[in-house]
Amino acid sequence: NGKVIKCDLVVSATGVIPNGDTIKIDDLILDSDNAITVNDQMETNLKHVYAAGDVASCSRWKHAPLWFQMRLWTQARQFGSYAAQCVHTAWLDNGNSKDLDFCFELFTHATKFFGFKVILQVRRKD
């Protein structure tokens, strides 16, 4: 659109490639990019088997309109924290499930590079 945005540093980050195909568990369902598919409780298609981080795919979730998976370390950390909460909720065995955390409502990535604060906020084009 011709708009110029001044900045001190530009970092191009595209995430990582999942390698779920290295995990040799019979009947474990992988996505087309070799990520382990998980439900909204981070559980795979195998009962009591969970996956989180870059190897997990949430492609079958009903996403909030401003969130998508980009496989950056901040999302991996959020997945890990949320997966631990889901495992604990399942361990309680009270019939409840864990509600999706707010971090799955809006995709943002905040970090520091070379002493600069970096905020990445992306809108995906479908």
For each predicted feature, which ranges?
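FAD-site-proximal beta/loop scaffold in flavoenzymes
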Residues: K3-Y82
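Mid-to-C-terminal Rossmann-like scaffold of FAD/NAD(P)H-dependent oxidoreductases
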Residues: V55-D126
